[in-house]
Amino acid sequence: WLGSQAKEFKAYLLRNDTVCFSYKDKDYHINIVGADIFPQGFSAIAKNLFMFKGANMLADIGNGTINIMHIIDQKPDVNTCSTEKFGTEQCVIRINEKIMQTFHTSIHENVITEVLRFGIADIAEKYLNIIVEEAREYTKEILERLKIHDYDAETMKLYIVGGGGCLIKNFGEYDKSRVFINDDIHATAKGYEYLAE
């Protein structure tokens, strides 16, 4: 996406020099002087790019997608940017389908999300066991999908950002010396502030 649509998207963002709008009974007038386009997830690691020596993969696991990019010797390789429609929402749907097949009932997605984020929720053990089992399987599939994009756990470091990092952290089997999970929910915003300086 970045390579093929970045110029068009930047032109779209810069189509107006000034934007005027009202929000909560206050008028705003903004002068747009430029726009920078970055790969998804990049802002969350931009400040620490100096740490990305050798071969690395960045995976931004969001609600609907996983955005992937290689970073080689501190240089993002935008030619390796790709997106997999395999985010946390698909995991929640899969879990609820399994619960429906097994117990002929469903669990509210907020309860499933609580288990995915924290590893536990106030539910019967039989439901918790299904959620954990499915989350472990889904996490294995995430790591397999990264391999399709040339991730090699023995020769690369993996940096995970985004809310879906909790899946890997809580249910994944990985080498903690080679996989780094940034679970700061403000990492992207902090990164954009850093890039704007």
Predicted segments, located by residue:
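Nucleotide/phosphate-binding catalytic cleft detector across ATP-hydrolyzing
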Residues: 1-56, 76-90, 110-197
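Short hydrophobic alpha-helical module
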Residues: 44, 71-74, 98-105
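Gly/Thr-rich phosphate-binding beta-strand-loop-beta motif of the actin/hexokinase/Hsp70
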Residues: 48-77, 95
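Conserved ATP-utilizing enzyme core subdomain
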Residues: 86-109
